[in-house]
């Protein structure tokens, strides 16, 4: 459903297109009249009007006036000091696109070159509206793709600034410090820390005690009265079957006294079965849910049982098969070999199960009496049907849906106040799902940039749908206080952002990341 603001923008765009169409018809009928007049440097260039009066980047803009000539290559348009792309020119109008970052809105047109050029400025400014755009926070990929992995600052020359990010990743904010963003990888053993305040990448957790480099998820505990403070522990799931059905699956890592996590932190095995794709914590009641790829099992563990055992000085038995009452198997979601992860609604009343290798999401509702999730049902996407299609429910198509996050929508009222955003890895984009199951594309697959090389994937920053492109995106989180998405772009080897565009010289603004565009080839 379109918001009131979106409907107004659609109506405005239609009037703009109608105006352009009318001018084009007039031009065709009267092509021997003033519309074919060439630029005369002895006469002034005049801007008499423009439409629409307001809009954002890549808005189509029609500027009326006199003495523009007919050669588009001879006309330069600047809006807010930024050069605009000129599409068409006739003597009495210029058709162009509003450039990104045209904050002041001042319209300036220069016709001609050198001494024969004439410049004029519109008497009123275009009202530029900021919009959400894609940026690049850190990381890069050079033309040889041999930059490797390097901890370090976000900024600086190649060989100094940080790089890596080249395995399938998952992101997680530290609940006690939103400037600390952790990332783990299916293929790289270290858990890395993206320090947003100090603009630095480090690898504090190399966790050499775990038997695999397949780290699938990061979560944090809720407060458990008498046992654990809020986010005192990090919960890490690994994908391993080297010990059959006694293979380590979920670890619990205690935060250091100084509030950090690193290789000094105490790490304990809390659950062992096999092939765990992820673990998550119920946001209200705090129980732990984890799964197995083997048969699509979902297990539940009340963390109080673990902490009681440890507090009494007893040994904890993490073997799932030995403790069926402690590790309760709730259900299997479908068939064997289902690679999936669980994303719980902030209210805890339901969860989406993202089935990565079978290209759809299921929904499971929460039994508040038993305090557990019930057998899920298909929600959006086609069961075992990969593809790309924005649609409703099971008619939508996706390809390798990965990490997702619930984001509050201020246009909604009542309990269903959240949309669900997820990265559609092999469709190279970020998608959105409404509570009703309407799937749409939010960012990526740039309409204009993809025309240049025929690819839906790329490294382009800018307008969400017109310009921005990703490649194999796998991680996604959202900072609701700053209203910023952070996206892990695996093949681009970068951390990307989706945030409201900012005027230049705001690098010191604590509310926004200082992005830099990544222009290296990602072929």
Can you say where each PLM-predicted feature lies in the sequence?
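Gly/Pro-rich loop segments of beta-rich domains
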Residues: 63, 130-167, 198-218, 240-242, ...
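Single conserved hydrophobic/aromatic residue that forms the stacking wall/gate
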Residues: 1-11
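Hydrophobic core register within WD40 beta-propeller blades
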Residues: 171-173, 218, 279, 340-344, ...
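Conserved beta-propeller blade signature
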Residues: 180-183, 227, 232-237, 287-291, ...
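Ser/Thr/Pro-rich low-complexity tracts
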Residues: 29-136, 180-182, 510-512, 518-520
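C-terminal motif of bacterial Sec signal peptides marking the signal peptidase cleavage site
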Residues: 24-27
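Blade-level signature of beta-propeller repeat domains, shared across WD40, Kelch, NHL, RCC1
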Residues: 468-523
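Short loop/turn segments immediately following the C-termini of beta-strands
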Residues: 112, 176, 184-187, 237-241, ...
